């Protein structure tokens, strides 16, 4: 799971329903480490890594807070950042080398890098049963973002995924669920 911040109900419910699941999270924000530490004090056994997703592993990049609460950061510099921290990056290829390629669920909420990660999943030939993605349309040109969204949805559909809207948001985000029915149990 990528992008933790203060919200890990999904991960906690995965643990409640599967005691043996290996749950891994990546998010370099200080709040995310506190969130996971709190959950783990309750016995949830979540393995957390303080790194940001990017196409290249091992880079040190600026991570910008997009609001003054410092709960949401992104790699793309916003017009008026409220804070910045330096973070190390990691990509899916490196993660697969470290943890293996057998994955059931990939969840991502990684402000502005959704297209890169959804593409890397396909390029690596990973075979998750479900991918949950928050796709921010407000980072960059709106029309270009929607063209990328249409393109990635089509690529997933071509290899047997059914794509659903997970939740209608109030902002300029699209939450999608990419599901492989023959692999997943609802």
Q: For each predicted feature, which ranges?
A:
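Phosphate/nucleotide-binding beta-alpha loop and adjacent structural elements of enzyme active sites
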Residues: 1-186
């Amino acid at each position: 799971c990528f992008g933790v911040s203060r919200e890990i109900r999904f991960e906690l419910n995965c643990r409640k329903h599967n005691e043996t699941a290996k749950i891994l999270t990546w998010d370099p924000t200080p709040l995310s480490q506190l969130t996971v530490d709190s959950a783990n004090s309750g016995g949830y056994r979540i393995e957390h890594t303080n790194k940001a997703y990017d196409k290249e592993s091992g880079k040190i990049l600026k991570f910008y807070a997009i609001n003054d609460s410092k709960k949401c950061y992104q790699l793309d510099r916003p017009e008026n950042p409220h804070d910045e921290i330096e973070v190390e990056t990691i990509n899916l290829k490196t993660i697969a080398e470290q943890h293996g390629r057998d994955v059931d669920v990939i969840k991502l909420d990684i402000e502005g890098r959704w297209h890169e990660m959804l593409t890397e999943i396909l390029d690596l030939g990973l075979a998750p049963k479900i991918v949950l993605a928050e796709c921010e349309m407000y980072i960059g040109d709106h029309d270009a973002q929607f063209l990328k969204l249409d393109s990635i949805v089509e690529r997933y559909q071509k290899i047997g995924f059914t794509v659903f809207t997970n939740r209608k948001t109030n902002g300029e985000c699209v939450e999608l669920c990419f599901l492989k029915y023959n692999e997943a149990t609802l």
